[in-house]
């Protein structure tokens, strides 16, 4: 689950991570009124969407007067902001964050992530702040420093100071930076985060260490422990199909292709998409129905896939372990009838009760194209979609 920058900064502030003063606004008039509450001569007007790259896309403006705040607010509100993370359609700006300007001396990057190679939380930092960290990793990887954190001990003060030294934080601000990083680590742990990232972290002319950005992703599996965080969810920023999928415990991510995929298991789903790509097709989604799919789940999965107007065919790839192939087959038949499917459909079943599952599909009288293997199924659906 993602949240807006201003919500992330409220969490930071509550846990001792230093941030500039700011206010959220939903209209240009409100933006001016909120700006009046800030003790500053420089205002930063920030578009609030669930995507990075807002600054480069024109979503962050520096205002030197209240009239400029109003001008920029009118310019941004209602705008479709297109960044490298939104896709060409962009995202509509519906709220703004009005923040105090500050005397920036230097920008840095810091982030806490989970390193799958070490199975540990890792602190990453660089003095190349304000730049996409992926770009830094590609061009100057030597400028990225890491500290692997012992889960028993947590982020040690010496690790925090070492990172601060390595990224050339001014000596007089080292202790403040170390305290800042330890507080940021506490946010990661106590809020069950999957990512906590600040780009940029800055040092100021007054010797302060501040977070000028706040990117926080939460572990969806831990949200039941954080009712307050659940309330921060902005459904308008999410794909309606993904919201609907979550109601039925389906893992769905929309993509840009035209072949809908329904698979059980994340690994098989990834392999299925790779195989479709290998044979010249383009997956329209990632959809994992999980290990306990029912007829109702399968029907809803079909409805969600068909909610994408770009879909021209569907590939169902099921390996029945805990989940039985005959149950899936019954669900497919019921779903195809209910949604009155007219698009090409290829189904590959393997595993428990597979022969009975195939019989159910064959006896249904529906236009379902069977496949014996994943490769065969991918080839068939790519061919059918291209011919459609």
Curated annotation (Swiss-Prot):
GO MF: ATP binding; magnesium ion binding; succinate-CoA ligase (ADP-forming) activity; succinate-CoA ligase (GDP-forming) activity
Cofactor, how bound (note): Binds 1 Mg(2+) ion per subunit.
Presence of the UniProt keyword Ligase in the record: yes
PANTHER family (alphabetical): SUCCINATE--COA LIGASE [GDP-FORMING] SUBUNIT BETA, MITOCHONDRIAL (PTHR11815:SF10), SUCCINYL-COA SYNTHETASE BETA CHAIN (PTHR11815)
Designated name of the protein: Succinate--CoA ligase [ADP-forming] subunit beta
Protein family according to the UniProt entry: Belongs to the succinate/malate CoA ligase beta subunit family.
Pathway where this protein functions: Carbohydrate metabolism; tricarboxylic acid cycle; succinate from succinyl-CoA (ligase route): step 1/1
Annotated keywords: ATP-binding, Ligase, Magnesium, Metal-binding, Nucleotide-binding, Tricarboxylic acid cycle
ATP-grasp domain segment(s): 9-244
Pfam families, A to Z: ATP-grasp_2, Ligase_CoA
Annotated function: Succinyl-CoA synthetase functions in the citric acid cycle (TCA), coupling the hydrolysis of succinyl-CoA to the synthesis of either ATP or GTP and thus represents the only step of substrate-level phosphorylation in the TCA. The beta subunit provides nucleotide specificity of the enzyme and binds the substrate succinate, while the binding sites for coenzyme A and phosphate are found in the alpha subunit.
Catalytic activity: succinate + ATP + CoA = succinyl-CoA + ADP + phosphate; GTP + succinate + CoA = succinyl-CoA + GDP + phosphate
Listed cofactors: Mg(2+)
Any one of the GO CC terms: succinate-CoA ligase complex
Residues binding Mg(2+), per UniProt: 199, 213
Stored InterPro entries: ATP-grasp, ATP-grasp_succ-CoA_synth-type, ATP_grasp_subdomain_1, Succ-CoA_synthase_bsu_CS, SUCC_ACL_C, Succ_CoA_ligase-like_bsu, Succinyl-CoA_synth-like
NCBIfam families reported for this sequence: PRK00696.1 (NF001913), sucCoAbeta (TIGR01016)
Description of how the protein assembles with itself and partners: Heterotetramer of two alpha and two beta subunits.
Sites where the protein binds substrate: 264, 321-323
EC number of the protein: 6.2.1.5
Name of the gene this protein is made from: sucC
GO BP: succinyl-CoA metabolic process; tricarboxylic acid cycle
